[in-house]
């Protein structure tokens, strides 16, 4: 990814010089910087995980904010549960944010026209659960068995890498779980992320 990102940076600088007052050019720079940060984190997957005990709420809020700016106003995201003060888990913030954004993006893609996405939090003694639900088209039983297979996709334009990579980040890197909690065709889908609380929390 290094060379394409460098090329994007160069083009962004050219645009910034040519259109210094354009409101979208700074946003482009922020997105490129963010892409570089995520790429750097991905390169470290497979090495020793560097997880920290952090509040989950700001990570989820950042993911929602990022997606809201990029979706139709016909789709709502209910994140009222994120008004809670603190939910501390072991995490790597940039990677976890990418996973949540990927789930939100999939939810948006599943909705035709108007619809709703809901984030809910649950917890037990050892774990915090994040549920991302949508009112989209749902996933049939045959597809459900394959959604985490690398290269499998039900989209016309897609590589089939998002969910497998998200699962790897959560399960191998965070020591948690990413699963399809439920899905019904014509009703919607819920994915669940399970993350560990710090020991002695």
Predicted regions mapped to residue ranges:
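Short beta-strand/loop element within the Bergerat-fold HATPase_c
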Residues: 114-126
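Short conserved segment of the HATPase_c
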Residues: 139-151
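Detector for a conserved hydrophobic position within an alpha-helical segment of the HATPase_c
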Residues: 170-171
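Glycine-rich ATP-binding loops of the HATPase_c
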Residues: 174-182
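Conserved catalytic submotifs in the C-terminal HATPase_c
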Residues: 76-87, 125
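Short alpha-helical Gxxx[C/S/T] motif in the catalytic ATP-binding
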Residues: 162, 166
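Conserved DHp (HisKA) dimerization/phosphotransfer helix of two-component histidine kinases, i.e.
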Residues: 7, 22-73
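Acidic ATP/Mg2+-coordinating residue in the GHKL
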Residues: 134
